[in-house]
């Protein structure tokens, strides 16, 4: 078995991906497959934390144009991320692997509050840690949350799961001449305006010296492949 490239990572998953081929909600077969991928990756000897978006349930930035204030809408979206974490936690635990959801919001009847100490302890106990509630503050995306939490818990990289196998010069689904980058610096990613992550996330990763690996989650086993150094993606670092 190949030695993993990283030993502690944050995996960023899109909430929209949880909907599968539906336009809304939770597609259980998709979540079950992701749970299996995360477990297989953990079995490589990697400590795994996960940040999930909430766009399959609610998008605060969209309702802010319909009479709901942006802070309120963002809070609703952050609560949706906790729902996704609980769904993934259940799918992981059905497979006999321990997982824990930690939230940026105090909700003791639902899950524990995120603290660095709690996250460190659960990761050391070989539990998959699911980080819900975003940053706990409006106006910040879950991409930024992933980088922030990675820096807080001492992760060595952020694995950004998307529906394409890296960062391209243009949308490869619209432009067949788009070129995939093997590697970019954080500044190049910012200057290029690539939409795979928001500028705040890239800037924070640059300031905290955190590599971001952008890859496609569509293929089963892709998380483990990235961790073992055999996967296809774009490394954003330096």
UniProtKB/Swiss-Prot annotation:
Concerning SUPFAM superfamilies, the annotation shows: Carbamate kinase-like
Q: Which GO terms describe its cellular component?
A: cytosol
Binding positions (UMP): 54, 74, 135-142
**Record-annotated residues binding ATP?**
12-15, 55, 59, 162-163, 168, 171
Query: What are the alphabetically sorted keywords of the record?
Result: ATP-binding, Cytoplasm, Kinase, Nucleotide-binding, Pyrimidine biosynthesis, Transferase
Q: Which InterPro entries match?
A: AceGlu_kinase-like_sf, Asp/Glu/Uridylate_kinase, Uridylate_kinase, Uridylate_kinase_bac
Q: Where in the cell is it found?
A: Cytoplasm
GO MF terms here are: ATP binding; UMP kinase activity
Tell me the domain of life.
Bacteria
Can you supply a Gene Ontology BP term from the record? 'de novo' CTP biosynthetic process
- Broad EC category: transferase
Any Pfam family: AA_kinase
* Modes of activity regulation: Inhibited by UTP.
Chief subcellular site?
A: cytoplasm
Q: What is its EC number?
A: 2.7.4.22
Protein family according to the UniProt entry: Belongs to the UMP kinase family.
Quaternary structure (record): Homohexamer.
Question: What is its biological role?
Answer: Catalyzes the reversible phosphorylation of UMP to UDP.
Q: What is this protein called?
A: Uridylate kinase
Source organism? Rhodopseudomonas palustris (strain BisA53)
Encoding gene per record: pyrH
